[in-house]
Amino acid sequence: ESLINANGWMVFIRLNDETKYKHKIEDLLTNRDAIKKDNSKQAETDGVDANIWWIELFQIVLHVCNLKRSQRISKPKLAIILSCYDQISNSTSTTTPKEIFEKELPLLNQFLHSNWEKDKISIWGLSSLGRALDGRSQNNFVDNGPENQGWIIAPDHHEKNADLTSPIVWIYG
């Protein structure tokens, strides 16, 4: 019932931990001559592609909530939060979270945008710690306090914002 009556859903996705087979297909195409010579190599299939896994999860949730897909969803709003955004290798100061999401999970992106109204879905980039913690940065992190280090990037923006509640404000705004 909480899902059905919610104003919005926030879904956190850590892109670096998601299995995406497009890269493996590219590797197979690039290395096909070497693979032909060594028939003992097989493609790894150690998990379901993230696009498929997330789409299936959304389909289950939409079914449980009895949200019909004959028309686009206006409620609940959907905020996709790309967590550990500072660790995403292809994020730059000129790319937006939306662009990263479209590139990394294209099938899921199409599924969500075909089911939600355009202004009822948003993609955010979140770094709750502001950096990856290692031996050197850990002490600096503790000295400066965690409350001063995180940031979020709003959809279609490049600038970091210290207000981590921005997606919640968007959902209720």
Task: Describe every region a protein language model picked out.
Residues 1:
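Switch II (G3) loop of P-loop NTPases
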Residues 4-5:
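Alpha-helix C-terminal capping/helix-to-coil transition sites in glycosyltransferase folds
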Residues 8-12, 17-25, 29-173:
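Conserved GTP-binding G-domain of TRAFAC-class P-loop NTPases and closely related GTPase folds
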